[in-house]
Amino acid sequence: MKIKELQKKIADALNGCEELVQGSCRAIVEDSMTVALDIQKQLQTVKGVAIVVMTPTFTRNGSCADGLPVETQLTIQCVEVPEHNRLQTGRLTALDAAEIVASSLDSNELNFIRIAQSADAPTRSIIVQVDFNVSIILN
């Protein structure tokens, strides 16, 4: 599996989650050429939660004939600007979205690690990070 394929598979699964869609959330992949614009559009135009699927680290996990086995950290960031997002009822907060992401993706393939929350003062946004471990074979 290629890294982009993994990210797209996860983003597609999240965009297919009715609870996230109804809560004004949209998942995008980090390696998209337009990721910054996509995040900005989601936060400023739709004024919902932007969910960014990333794979920041890889560690070799043995060897095999089919490719390179790796363990990767899958990071999903749920980003919101509360003053925009929370103006309408029925919208999910970044933390709400992160909890749904964690519970909907935790499986034998994706092992949930943690949820961590932070604030970015310059952009007035809240970022909630959901981390998983996943083993794949890069080919």
How should each PLM-predicted stretch be described?
Residues 1-65, 92:
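Small/polar-rich, solvent-exposed N-terminal microdomains that initiate assembly or binding
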Residues 82-94:
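Short histidine-centered catalytic/ligand-binding loop motif
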